[in-house]
């Protein structure tokens, strides 16, 4: 990973045009080739980004007023969309090899919820059938991939406490899975013991169904039914 802190401006050129004026920002270049631009707010969300596959070309261009050559990064994807990052001042430039990430390790309850739901996948609806648990994608495994009563693909993300991060994670999985002609269209189910109101609103706005899981009921202590909302 490369982390650059610089005073820069950013121009996006593609389906539309967008401009970030000159300011101090963090530029993050990951091993997969992705490039993202961050400010000192917005939590984990970048101001702008380019996902792989894309290329990063470091060059210079002449400043019109002074005639001085200043650094210019050109990040371009296969569609020809570009991020043009003009660097006025470089504060820090650091490389670090993070190595292969083992991925997110679910806690015991989440892992057991996944196992139980996979065993009783029909609790999501009559006619549902399991394809597999931990369905692999380039950005990590989907908890459960199944099919509904009409044969449509459904990706299920399971959390103990469902927040916005979980909805965003499922949204990224759905974006990738829907590029696969053998699976598309792929619907989403966000399942958790407790789903925060903001997460539910975001999920429903994106067409993702929310399912509240009762851990004890799934284990057969009270009943075998889920409460669906």
Curated annotation (Swiss-Prot):
One CC-aspect GO term: cytoplasm
EC number: 3.1.-.-
Xref: NCBIfam families: PRK03298.1 (NF002876)
Pfam families tied to this protein: NucS_C, NucS_N
CDD domains, per the entry: NucS-like
UniProt enzyme class: hydrolase
Gene Ontology terms, MF aspect: DNA binding; single-stranded DNA endodeoxyribonuclease activity
Domain of life: Bacteria
Family recorded in the similarity comment: Belongs to the NucS endonuclease family.
Protein name: Endonuclease NucS
Key words, A-Z: Cytoplasm, DNA-binding, Endonuclease, Hydrolase, Nuclease
HAMAP family linked: NucS
Protein function: Cleaves both 3' and 5' ssDNA extremities of branched DNA structures.
Subcellular localization, as worded in the UniProt entry: Cytoplasm
